[in-house]
Regions:
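Interfacial loop-to-helix junctions that mark the boundaries of transmembrane helices
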Residues: 1-6, 53-64, 90, 130-144
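Single transmembrane alpha-helix segments in multi-pass membrane proteins
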Residues: 2-49, 80-90, 94
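Hydrophobic alpha-helical transmembrane segments
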Residues: 4, 37-41, 59-68, 93-98, ...
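Helix-loop-helix "hairpin" substructures at the membrane interface of multi-pass membrane proteins
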Residues: 10, 136-210
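Alpha-helical transmembrane segments of polytopic integral membrane proteins
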Residues: 18-27, 46, 73-79, 102, ...
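Hydrophobic core segments of alpha-helical transmembrane domains in multi-pass membrane transport
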Residues: 43-47, 66-73, 101-110, 147-156, ...
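Alpha-helical transmembrane segments within multi-pass membrane transporters and channels
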Residues: 55-102
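Transmembrane helix-bundle core of multi-pass membrane transporters
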Residues: 84, 91-161, 187-188
Length: 210
Protein backbone atom coordinates (compact mmCIF):
# COMPACT_ATOMS: atom_id res chain seq x y z
CA UNK A 1 0.00 0.00 0.00
CA UNK A 2 2.84 2.41 0.78
CA UNK A 3 4.28 1.88 -2.70
CA UNK A 4 0.85 2.61 -4.16
CA UNK A 5 0.59 5.84 -2.17
CA UNK A 6 4.07 6.90 -3.29
CA UNK A 7 3.21 6.18 -6.91
CA UNK A 8 -0.06 8.11 -6.98
CA UNK A 9 1.60 11.54 -7.23
CA UNK A 10 3.94 10.30 -9.95
CA UNK A 11 0.98 8.83 -11.80
CA UNK A 12 -0.80 12.18 -11.64
CA UNK A 13 2.19 13.87 -13.30
CA UNK A 14 2.24 11.16 -15.97
CA UNK A 15 -1.42 11.95 -16.59
CA UNK A 16 -0.46 15.57 -17.32
CA UNK A 17 2.21 14.35 -19.73
CA UNK A 18 -0.25 12.00 -21.46
CA UNK A 19 -2.81 14.77 -21.90
CA UNK A 20 -0.12 16.98 -23.46
CA UNK A 21 0.62 14.28 -26.02
CA UNK A 22 -3.05 13.46 -26.61
CA UNK A 23 -4.31 17.00 -27.17
CA UNK A 24 -1.85 17.58 -30.03
CA UNK A 25 -2.56 14.15 -31.49
CA UNK A 26 -6.31 14.84 -31.42
CA UNK A 27 -5.88 17.82 -33.77
CA UNK A 28 -2.90 17.02 -35.98
CA UNK A 29 -2.99 13.19 -35.81
CA UNK A 30 0.69 12.71 -35.01
CA UNK A 31 2.67 11.95 -31.87
CA UNK A 32 4.64 15.04 -30.89
CA UNK A 33 7.91 13.44 -29.80
CA UNK A 34 9.29 16.91 -29.05
CA UNK A 35 6.96 17.01 -26.03
CA UNK A 36 9.33 14.85 -24.00
CA UNK A 37 12.22 17.16 -24.79
CA UNK A 38 10.20 20.16 -23.66
CA UNK A 39 9.47 18.44 -20.35
CA UNK A 40 13.19 17.85 -19.77
CA UNK A 41 14.06 21.40 -20.76
CA UNK A 42 11.42 22.84 -18.44
CA UNK A 43 12.74 20.71 -15.57
CA UNK A 44 16.17 22.30 -16.04
CA UNK A 45 14.63 25.76 -16.38
CA UNK A 46 12.75 25.25 -13.13
CA UNK A 47 15.89 24.05 -11.38
CA UNK A 48 18.02 27.02 -12.43
CA UNK A 49 15.20 29.45 -11.67
CA UNK A 50 14.98 28.08 -8.13
CA UNK A 51 18.75 27.82 -7.69
CA UNK A 52 19.43 31.36 -8.93
CA UNK A 53 17.97 32.87 -5.74
CA UNK A 54 19.64 32.85 -2.33
CA UNK A 55 16.16 32.46 -0.92
CA UNK A 56 14.21 30.39 -3.46
CA UNK A 57 10.82 31.88 -4.39
CA UNK A 58 7.58 30.10 -3.49
CA UNK A 59 7.14 26.93 -5.47
CA UNK A 60 4.04 28.24 -7.27
CA UNK A 61 6.18 31.05 -8.74
CA UNK A 62 8.55 28.47 -10.21
CA UNK A 63 5.60 26.47 -11.57
CA UNK A 64 4.16 29.60 -13.18
CA UNK A 65 7.54 30.56 -14.67
CA UNK A 66 8.16 27.13 -16.19
CA UNK A 67 4.58 27.05 -17.47
CA UNK A 68 5.16 30.29 -19.38
CA UNK A 69 8.48 28.95 -20.67
CA UNK A 70 6.76 25.77 -21.81
CA UNK A 71 4.09 27.76 -23.68
CA UNK A 72 6.74 29.91 -25.39
CA UNK A 73 8.78 26.83 -26.32
CA UNK A 74 5.77 24.99 -27.75
CA UNK A 75 4.67 27.97 -29.85
CA UNK A 76 8.23 28.44 -31.12
CA UNK A 77 8.49 24.78 -32.11
CA UNK A 78 5.12 24.95 -33.86
CA UNK A 79 6.14 28.09 -35.75
CA UNK A 80 9.55 26.80 -36.81
CA UNK A 81 8.89 23.09 -37.35
CA UNK A 82 5.21 22.44 -37.98
CA UNK A 83 3.49 25.48 -39.45
CA UNK A 84 5.14 25.20 -42.85
CA UNK A 85 4.12 21.54 -43.02
CA UNK A 86 0.51 22.55 -42.36
CA UNK A 87 0.57 25.24 -45.03
CA UNK A 88 1.85 22.76 -47.60
CA UNK A 89 -0.70 20.17 -46.42
CA UNK A 90 2.10 17.62 -46.34
CA UNK A 91 1.53 14.00 -45.22
CA UNK A 92 1.54 13.14 -41.53
CA UNK A 93 4.94 11.49 -41.97
CA UNK A 94 6.48 14.97 -42.26
CA UNK A 95 5.16 15.89 -38.80
CA UNK A 96 6.57 12.64 -37.45
CA UNK A 97 10.04 13.34 -38.87
CA UNK A 98 9.98 16.98 -37.78
CA UNK A 99 9.00 16.09 -34.21
CA UNK A 100 11.80 13.50 -33.93
CA UNK A 101 14.27 16.05 -35.29
CA UNK A 102 13.19 18.64 -32.73
CA UNK A 103 13.34 16.06 -29.93
CA UNK A 104 16.91 15.11 -30.88
CA UNK A 105 17.88 18.78 -31.16
CA UNK A 106 16.56 19.55 -27.67
CA UNK A 107 18.32 16.49 -26.27
CA UNK A 108 21.65 17.53 -27.80
CA UNK A 109 21.30 21.11 -26.57
CA UNK A 110 20.66 19.84 -23.04
CA UNK A 111 23.67 17.52 -23.33
CA UNK A 112 25.92 20.38 -24.45
CA UNK A 113 24.91 22.66 -21.58
CA UNK A 114 24.36 20.17 -18.77
CA UNK A 115 26.17 16.98 -19.80
CA UNK A 116 25.73 13.99 -17.52
CA UNK A 117 25.72 16.02 -14.31
CA UNK A 118 23.00 15.29 -11.79
CA UNK A 119 21.04 18.26 -10.48
CA UNK A 120 18.74 18.30 -7.47
CA UNK A 121 16.04 20.88 -6.90
CA UNK A 122 16.46 23.03 -3.79
CA UNK A 123 14.21 21.74 -1.03
CA UNK A 124 10.75 23.14 -1.68
CA UNK A 125 9.47 22.27 1.76
CA UNK A 126 10.90 20.81 4.86
CA UNK A 127 10.79 17.04 4.48
CA UNK A 128 7.73 16.66 6.66
CA UNK A 129 5.41 13.69 6.50
CA UNK A 130 2.03 12.97 7.94
CA UNK A 131 0.43 9.64 8.63
CA UNK A 132 -2.96 8.08 8.00
CA UNK A 133 -2.86 4.78 9.81
CA UNK A 134 0.32 3.04 8.71
CA UNK A 135 0.60 5.05 5.48
CA UNK A 136 3.06 7.96 5.17
CA UNK A 137 2.43 11.01 2.96
CA UNK A 138 5.26 13.44 2.23
CA UNK A 139 4.52 17.13 1.79
CA UNK A 140 6.02 17.30 -1.72
CA UNK A 141 4.09 14.24 -2.94
CA UNK A 142 0.89 15.72 -1.57
CA UNK A 143 1.58 19.07 -3.25
CA UNK A 144 2.37 17.40 -6.58
CA UNK A 145 -0.84 15.38 -6.41
CA UNK A 146 -2.96 18.43 -5.58
CA UNK A 147 -1.41 20.58 -8.34
CA UNK A 148 -1.83 17.81 -10.92
CA UNK A 149 -5.47 17.17 -10.03
CA UNK A 150 -6.30 20.89 -10.07
CA UNK A 151 -4.67 21.32 -13.49
CA UNK A 152 -6.52 18.30 -14.88
CA UNK A 153 -9.82 19.58 -13.48
CA UNK A 154 -9.27 23.04 -15.02
CA UNK A 155 -8.38 21.49 -18.37
CA UNK A 156 -11.45 19.25 -18.26
CA UNK A 157 -13.62 22.30 -17.63
CA UNK A 158 -11.99 24.28 -20.45
CA UNK A 159 -12.39 21.47 -22.98
CA UNK A 160 -16.02 20.70 -22.08
CA UNK A 161 -17.51 24.01 -20.95
CA UNK A 162 -15.86 26.85 -22.89
CA UNK A 163 -16.07 28.09 -26.48
CA UNK A 164 -12.40 27.42 -27.17
CA UNK A 165 -12.87 23.90 -25.83
CA UNK A 166 -15.83 23.41 -28.17
CA UNK A 167 -13.70 24.68 -31.06
CA UNK A 168 -10.90 22.26 -30.17
CA UNK A 169 -13.32 19.34 -30.11
CA UNK A 170 -14.90 20.44 -33.40
CA UNK A 171 -11.54 20.66 -35.19
CA UNK A 172 -10.50 17.31 -33.72
CA UNK A 173 -13.67 15.61 -34.98
CA UNK A 174 -13.98 17.23 -38.41
CA UNK A 175 -11.50 19.96 -39.47
CA UNK A 176 -13.23 20.66 -42.79
CA UNK A 177 -16.70 21.07 -41.27
CA UNK A 178 -15.33 23.26 -38.47
CA UNK A 179 -13.80 25.62 -41.04
CA UNK A 180 -17.17 25.88 -42.79
CA UNK A 181 -18.68 26.83 -39.42
CA UNK A 182 -16.24 29.75 -39.16
CA UNK A 183 -13.79 28.23 -36.69
CA UNK A 184 -10.25 29.51 -37.22
CA UNK A 185 -8.24 26.30 -37.18
CA UNK A 186 -4.93 28.18 -36.98
CA UNK A 187 -5.97 29.79 -33.70
CA UNK A 188 -7.19 26.44 -32.40
CA UNK A 189 -3.89 24.76 -33.27
CA UNK A 190 -1.91 27.54 -31.58
CA UNK A 191 -4.11 27.16 -28.51
CA UNK A 192 -3.57 23.40 -28.47
CA UNK A 193 0.21 23.82 -28.64
CA UNK A 194 0.06 26.46 -25.90
CA UNK A 195 -1.89 24.05 -23.67
CA UNK A 196 0.55 21.22 -24.44
CA UNK A 197 3.48 23.53 -23.67
CA UNK A 198 1.92 24.61 -20.39
CA UNK A 199 1.44 20.97 -19.40
CA UNK A 200 5.06 20.24 -20.35
CA UNK A 201 6.24 23.12 -18.17
CA UNK A 202 4.15 22.04 -15.20
CA UNK A 203 4.99 18.34 -15.45
CA UNK A 204 8.69 19.08 -15.96
CA UNK A 205 9.03 21.12 -12.80
CA UNK A 206 6.90 18.67 -10.80
CA UNK A 207 9.04 15.74 -11.89
CA UNK A 208 12.17 17.73 -11.07
CA UNK A 209 10.90 18.67 -7.62
CA UNK A 210 9.95 15.06 -6.87
Amino acid sequence: LQLLVSGISLGAVYALIAVGFAIVFSILKFSNFAHGGMISACAFIGYFFQASFDNPPPFYVTVLFTTLCGVAMALLIDTVAYRRIRKKQAPTLYYFLASITVAILIEQILNVFFGKNIYAFPAVFSSTTFHIGSLRFSSIDTLILVISLVILAILLYVINKTRIGLAIRAVAINPAASRLMGINSSVVIMTVFAIAGALAGISGVLLGAK
